[in-house]
């Protein structure tokens, strides 16, 4: 996978997954918001180019192209296995929209890849059910006025995942659209800092 790496001064790693049409530099501003001392691994989606770039093929009639989705999840897991992540004491995956959906797919395969997951504006797609991980902390965020996300379906999915796989998952709702508002960024930063302080 193509990626951009920034070496930090702390034993923390942020892994960024951009939204549709983004690239490996689209989410670097979040390092400034979250943790300037952390190292960053920011990934390029492997499907499409330019405004179409994403982490997996577009939906077909609202459903995942499961063959493509599984192939790209497997490719990421192979890539991740080859990385030297031993120096990092805290790993946080952060995804927006398509990138958050991709992370949700990863959670159905290996729910222990990271310590924390920040899923910004994901969708309730036809994912397989995740394996249990009572340790991982997951923050889902939702823009109540987002045109691309069914808020009720996402609330139901988060409730199911919380009850059966990730008891430390929670959903934060914002009265905005499909973008990161300042209120949301502040909330996410505080959530992340609380978990960083716990590790200190």
Protein language model features and the residues they cover:
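Active-site signature of alpha/beta-hydrolase-fold catalytic machinery across serine-
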Residues: 29, 105-109
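Conserved alpha/beta-hydrolase "acid-adjacent" motif
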Residues: 147-154
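C-terminal catalytic histidine-bearing segment of alpha/beta-hydrolase fold enzymes
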Residues: 139, 155, 168-200
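Short beta-strand/loop motif that positions the catalytic acidic residue
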Residues: 139-146
């Amino acid at each position: 996978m193509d990626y951009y790496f920034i070496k930090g001064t702390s034993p923390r790693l942020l892994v960024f997954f951009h939204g549709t049409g983004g690239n490996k530099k689209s989410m670097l501003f979040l390092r400034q918001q979250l943790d300037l001392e952390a190292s960053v691994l920011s990934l390029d989606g492997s499907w499409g180019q330019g405004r179409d770039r994403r982490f997996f093929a577009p939906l077909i009639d609202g459903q995942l192209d499961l063959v493509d989705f599984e192939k790209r999840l497997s490719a990421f897991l192979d890539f991740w296995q080859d990385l030297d992540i031993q120096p990092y004491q805290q790993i946080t995956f952060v995804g927006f929209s398509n990138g958050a959906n991709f992370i949700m797919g990863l959670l159905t395969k290996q729910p222990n890849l990271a310590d924390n997951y920040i899923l910004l504006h994901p969708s309730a797609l036809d994912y397989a059910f995740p394996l249990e991980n009572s340790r991982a902390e997951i923050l889902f965020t939702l823009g109540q006025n987002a045109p691309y996300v069914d808020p009720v379906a996402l609330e139901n999915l988060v409730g199911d995942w919380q009850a059966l796989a990730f008891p430390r998952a929670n959903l934060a709702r914002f009265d905005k659209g499909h973008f990161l508002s300042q209120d949301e960024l502040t909330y996410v930063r505080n959530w992340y800092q609380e978990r960083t302080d716990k590790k200190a």
